From Swiss-Prot:
Keywords: Cell membrane, Glycoprotein, Membrane, Transmembrane, Transmembrane helix
Post-translational modification (record): Degraded in a lysosome-dependent manner before hatching.
Species of origin: Caenorhabditis elegans
Subcellular location: Apical cell membrane
GO BP terms in the entry: endocytosis; molting cycle, collagen and cuticulin-based cuticle; nematode male tail mating organ morphogenesis
Family: Belongs to the patched family.
Descriptive protein name: Patched-related protein 18
UniProt domain SSD: residue ranges: 263-420
Key word NADP present: no
């Protein structure tokens, strides 16, 4: 075990030395050509930004939020292919509800409802070109699908007025002159007579407007009519009688897009807030060392990386999704974090060194730290690229590319800015009025004395902080807090709900929300339809063919939560009696009557349930006449997604028993139910892979067993808190929250890696000195970074939408937990555990000419072992060992 630890330590030392030397060399090169570096990086960003000419926004909830390997996606494709010969489907749902919440079957409400239905069918028109079109103009063979409501309301009104009883308006289906009309898909919140099942009240009525389009012109006509319908429903908001609601796949996509559009202008507000914060927290009293302009360019740096990364992806043909809207906010916060670390490292370099040396030393100091955090962020997001959900894939591609560009621009663009800033410092130019010279002070001034007092106060605060960390009672206090925290978070993880509903994609004031909530609370409970596609019917003339189909139908009619035969739509039920009429009593299946049957007005609606081949094949009684067909039956009392998934799996299992018929089931909302199949295992595997990658990085850069175990435990603890808090913040596990969890993993490692790296690399024999050195070196930049990130993200709290609020809540949470673990928990744990580090010789500053011209770095000495508070110490005892400690602390305080 000791040899493995020693080997890891040697590997880490070699990586540390090579990384240090590489960044030192890069710093020298940038210092040699700062203006060329700025020019090249800026031009590249502008060239890539030209990719906006290929910008294409897409937004389809079904396509982008369902996994590519989910059963529902295949089932949807089968359904689309079935209707493809007719054209592409267009579907809008309109619901009517009494303004006072009462029954719609009261006389004046029925009149109003019929008036609305007639208006929507014939009088509401959308314009295209020089013509206007109503629904009746483009519905074609689908017009009858919206007739059930008008038939029911008209007959109910006539029955109330004339007191006739020749038609019984029963529920869930009624018989109209020999034709059964199923009402449970249109009439909801029904009160019936317990004896006769006759409908007495109904508080909600839904009308389904179906149509088929075959070309882009027809699609545009329907979309225009849909927008007119949407505008009309908004106008009924204050109607004294009836409130009208509408939803459709197209309107849902538009609402999701509206969320993104509303968030984008806030990017400007975020930029100004971050700019002000960055400038104010990097100002110094010394007008030469202060860096307001550099801070401004530091905030511009992530903007350039966004232009370059987004443009690059647009050039490559990637499409933009609304969920990508939050990427600029995240990259701005990540990029500004690196600016604080860079400026902090610059101020720690000796002022008397040349600009060239200072840049090399700055990059050698800050480069590895920034590399670790950038690598962890990149890996946590890049792993999401392999998830099967397109929305997560697209989000992760955009943010991963942006992280790479941000890292490159921080290393090159901002380093070049610091070089020019250093040249200004050398020339003693004013940071605010850079054309003015600032004379050297001849003697200490009052302000400088005051600055020394401030430094002393900060030093005392740091000492108090370290005293708290080193105290025994603090370990018991934090231990009790952490145990309580883990218990509550573990409980939250066990209770987290899974699933995405369409209402989570809307703004809180979306006009679609009322109907979506009615669907969830009322329609899902009272009615739904499952369609069964028979893709390979075979020879229906065989004696066992039709009986087998009817047995399958019966199995679905009596399955769990099924309504029964009253809800069934099966074309064979009217067709077989028709064949009997033609055959004078025999009802054996015949193909030759199919074309004639579907042309008859009373049976025309059944033509949508079959795919016929060549008509001549039908006349010749060939099985190729009937290529496919579909039937459907109703179900109810399936409100939760877990209940609906149980039904789906039961139906799929039944369908799988008939491989020779190639049965496929389809239900409109199966994409949401199927997320329970994929989101949990995908989240588990993705998070597991991300955590393994984080642990490998921490092991590579800080190979001490103490730092490996503690930092890994800290990352796990932070993420346990993030996962556990989801249930307390009313957030479910869905594709949206999954992307934020990937982000949380990367962010959590940032805080842990910074403090662990500074603790590990410190060459001190005292735990107190090592912890003090780590906190003095990174606490303030960590605070700046965390605060700036929260400022960047909390602006989005103005957007009242679940899709955006999830990011805000999780980012604020992970920053709070990360800072608490990084600045309090880990230092206390470090103070309680022994620490052993394989250490090479103290790094010697290499002269620029040696690094740049003389070739390789001088050979390192043999590694030594430093044991903090141990019994042995293989390094020579130094009587002046506290001197470097105090020197480091004073340097950190000056920064």
């Amino acid at each position: 075990m000791k040899s493995i630890s020693q080997c890891l330590g040697n590997v880490s030392l070699w990586i540390e030395q090579q990384t240090h030397d590489m960044f030192y060399w890069v710093g020298l090169k940038i210092a040699d050509y700062p203006k060329w570096t700025l020019f090249i990086t800026t031009i590249w960003a502008l060239l890539m930004a030209g990719g906006v000419v290929r910008f294409k926004e897409v937004n389809n909830v079904r396509d982008h939020f369902s996994a590519t390997n989910s059963p529902s996606r295949y089932e949807y494709r089968v359904a689309r292919e079935f209707f493809q010969e007719l054209g592409s489907p267009f579907h809008v749902v309109v619901a009517m509800q009494a303004a006072d919440g009462g029954s719609l079957l009261r006389p004046k409400y029925i009149d109003k409802a019929l008036e609305i239905e007639d208006f929507l069918q014939y009088k509401l028109k959308g314009s295209f070109g020089n013509q206007s079109y109503s629904y009746s103009d483009f519905c074609g063979t689908q017009c009858e699908t919206s007739d059930a409501v008008s038939i029911f309301l008209s007959m109910f009104r006539d029955q109330q007025i004339k007191k006739t009883a020749h038609v019984k308006l029963t529920y869930p289906s009624m018989d109209v002159f020999g034709h059964r009309v199923y009402l449970a898909n249109n009439i909801f919140q029904v009160k019936i007579n317990n004896r006769s099942s006759i409908i007495e009240e109904s508080k909600l009525v839904a009308i389904n407007f179906h149509a088929i389009y075959n070309n882009e012109t027809m699609y545009e006509i329907m979309k225009e009519w849909e927008q007119k319908l949407f505008a009309y429903t908004l106008s009924t908001e204050n109607d004294p009688l009836i409130r009208v609601y509408v939803t459709s796949e197209g309107l849902v996509s538009e609402e999701v897009r509206r969320t993104g559009i509303l968030a984008m202008p806030l990017m400007g507000v975020t930029f100004l807030i971050i700019l002000a914060f960055t400038i104010l927290t990097t100002l110094k009293r010394d007008p030469v060392k202060s860096k307001p302009f550099e801070a401004f360019l530091g905030v511009i740096c992530p903007i350039l990386s966004l232009c370059a990364s987004f443009g690059h992806l647009f050039w490559m043909g990637f499409e933009y999704l609304p969920i990508v809207t939050v990427v600029p906010f995240l990259i701005l916060s990540i990029g500004v974090d690196d600016v604080f670390i860079f400026i902090h490292a610059w101020h720690r370099t000796p002022y008397k060194h040349s600009v060239r040396d200072r840049m090399a030393e700055t990059l050698a100091d800050a480069g590895p730290s920034i590399s670790i955090t950038s690598l962890t962020n990149l890996l946590s997001f890049a792993i999401g690229i392999f998830t099967p959900t397109p929305a997560i894939y697209t989000f992760c591609v955009f943010i991963s590319t942006a992280v790479i560009y941000d890292y490159i621009y921080q290393i090159f663009f901002f380093s070049a800015v610091l070089v020019l800033s250093g040249e200004r410092e050398e020339q003693r130019k004013n940071a605010y009025l850079w054309w003015k010279d600032v004379p050297l002070p001849e003697e200490p001034t009052g302000k400088q004395k005051k600055e020394t007092i401030v430094s002393r106060v900060l030093g005392k605060v740091l000492d108090f902080w370290v005293d708290f960390i080193m105290a025994k009672w603090s370990k018991f206090l934090i231990g009790a807090i952490m145990i309580t925290y883990w218990i509550f978070m573990a409980r939250g993880v066990m209770e987290i709900a899974v699933g995405l509903s369409s209402e989570k994609l809307f703004l809180d004031d979306s006009p679609l929300l009322p109907l979506v909530r009615l669907q969830t609370n009322v329609i899902f409970k009272e009615g739904g339809q499952v369609a069964v596609f028979v893709n390979n019917p075979g020879n229906m003339s065989e004696p066992d063919a039709v009986p087998e189909i009817m047995r399958i139908l019966r199995r679905f009619e009596v399955a769990n939560n099924s309504v029964g035969a009253a809800s069934t739509h099966m074309w064979l039920l009217p067709y077989l009696p028709y064949v009997g009429e033609q055959e004078h009593g025999s009802i054996e299946f015949k193909y030759r009557y199919l074309p004639e049957f579907f042309k008859l007005t009373e049976f025309r609606r059944w033509s949508h349930f079959v795919n016929l081949g060549n008509h001549q094949d039908c006349l010749s009684e060939k099985p190729s006449c009937l290529q496919k067909f579909v039937f459907s039956t109703g179900f109810h009392d399936a409100v939760s997604w877990s209940d609906r998934l149980a039904l789906l799996e039961n139906w799929r299992e039944m369908a799988s028993e008939y491989q020779h018929l190639n049965l496929t089931i389809y239900e409109d909302f199966s994409m949401y139910s199927d997320q329970l199949l994929t989101i949990v295992p995908v989240t588990q595997s993705t998070v597991f892979c991300a955590l393994i990658c984080m642990i490998m990085i921490l092991t590579l850069f800080t190979p001490s067993p103490v730092t490996i175990v503690t930092s890994t435990a800290a990352v796990l603890s932070i993420n346990l808190g993030v996962f556990g808090c989801l249930v307390y913040m009313n957030i479910d596990l869905d594709p949206i929250s999954m992307t934020t969890l990937l982000m949380a993993i990367g962010f959590s490692v940032d805080f842990v890696a910074h403090i662990t790296w500074h603790y590990y690399k410190g060459d001190f024999h005292s735990k107190r000195a090592r912890i003090r050195h780590a906190l003095a070196g990174i606490a303030w930049p960590m605070f700046q970074a965390g605060t700036s990130t929260m400022l960047a993200i909390t602006v989005l709290a103005l957007v009242h939408a679940y899709m955006v609020q999830v990011f805000v809540k999780v980012v604020v949470l992970v920053i709070f937990l990360g800072m608490f673990h990084g600045l309090v928990v880990l230092p206390i744990v470090f103070s309680a555990l022994p620490f052993t580090k394989t250490s090479g010789p103290q790094k010697k500053k290499v002269a620029p000419l040696q690094m740049h011209e003389a070739g390789p770095i001088p050979k390192k000495e043999e590694p030594k072992v430093i044991k903090v508070n141990g019994e042995e110490d293989e390094e020579d005892e130094k009587t002046t060992k506290e001197e470097p400690v105090e020197k480091s602390v004073r340097s950190a305080e000056r920064a």
